[in-house]
Amino acid sequence: MMKSIQPIIELMGELRNFTLFWCGQSLSEIGTRLTGFGLSIWVYQNTHTVTQLSLMIFFTTLPGVLITPFVGALVDRQQRKSIVMMSDIAAALITLTLAALLITNNLQLWHTYISAFLTSVCGSFQMIAKSAALPMMVPKEQIGRANGLMNFSTAVGQLCAPILAGILIVIVQLQGLLLIDFSTYVIGVFTLLFIQIPQPESDKRRSTGVFGIIDDIIFGWERISSRIYLLILLGFMTIYFFVYGLTDVLINPLILSFASIKTYGSIMSLAGCGMVCGSIFMSIWGGSQKSILPLFIFSALNGVGLVIAGIKPSIPIISVGVLISFFTLPVILSTNNTIWQTSVEPQVQGRVISLLNTVTGLGVAIGNLSASPLADGILEPMLNSDGLLADTVGRIIETGQGRGIGFLLVIEGLLIFSISLSLYYYFRQLGEEILVTGSEIVVLEKINTIEE
């Protein structure tokens, strides 16, 4: 056991800056998730409508996605440590304001929308600045492990925040959760005071003003489009996140179509454990330093997990599928991040990563919006006992409530599996691992040769 976690211990021991940064920001992230969970409970308890809750979630996600390209351009212009610190401080002040409004009995529903919007903006700055700062703090050969640790924090937050929030909101109420979140921000900012985040060389072609920022965004896109393997990867990850957006909406009604709420909670706890284990695995393994191929291996496994989860209305079968899918998720995300962070010059990473996040974020949003029309409007009626597919597909995956959703998960899984397998063999034909080549010309020449 000690031998297996030795790489993580060595990484954290050698890289003091990254360790302090990771600890402070991880604590801050958990605090943010506590507040998000607590506010969602407050909104629902005070409105008793899903619509108002959906609006709050909308203001939490979409604004951040839409402004991300501009955030990336600004991140490349400023000190990344300062951006993380200022966004932490801004988010802390938003949380403190909410706590003050709640304590004085002045908190209104529209306050939560505004706070969700502003927190989303702060989160965009934090996410892009942290992604761009990580390669500056960690040697190239350790970036995979560092990304694994960052995803470990996310997984722990997703697993523990609902449980902790459910306990704490009874003891200290929502205002207590908000003050705990504020404290985690303070700790996060405090740790930043003791670390150094190296700044890359400035971009000599930088212009000023609004048009300068737009020009920076265009330049970031040119850095992506000039490398065919990055364009292919961007397209693949957009499809993957579209499927993720579908699954995120469908997993709840799929399980509840034949199981209890308690069973649903148990399966999702298993999913959280899978994410934690996947993050630990990635932190120990560190990923392949010279190959894009492991990304497609684990995404193919992710597709297999989705097929298993959708194939039968069985708790053990769905549990296995969910476990496989969520175990591979942090490995896929960490590997994807590592590819981008090692393939793009440090001084343009803010712009490039922000464009990646914008496109994939839109993929998630489209997946969220498409889930209901595809499942309820098309596939669920087809897999009723007298539906169009009852005597064909229904013989395999069964018919009735939730089977249209299950069939959609099977389709998603087969889609991801087939694309992953195709790209695996496509890149394998190159005859050379291309992740950290340091030369786009070599990669492009090899791809062009194959296509001819």
Predicted regions and their residues:
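Helix-loop junctions on the cytosolic side of multi-pass membrane transporters
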Residues: 105, 132, 136-137, 178-209, ...
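Juxtamembrane intracellular "pre-TM" segments in multi-pass secondary transporters
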Residues: 2-18, 198-235, 443-447, 451-452
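Pair of pore-lining "gating" transmembrane helices in MFS-fold secondary transporters
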Residues: 9-41, 117, 222-246, 323
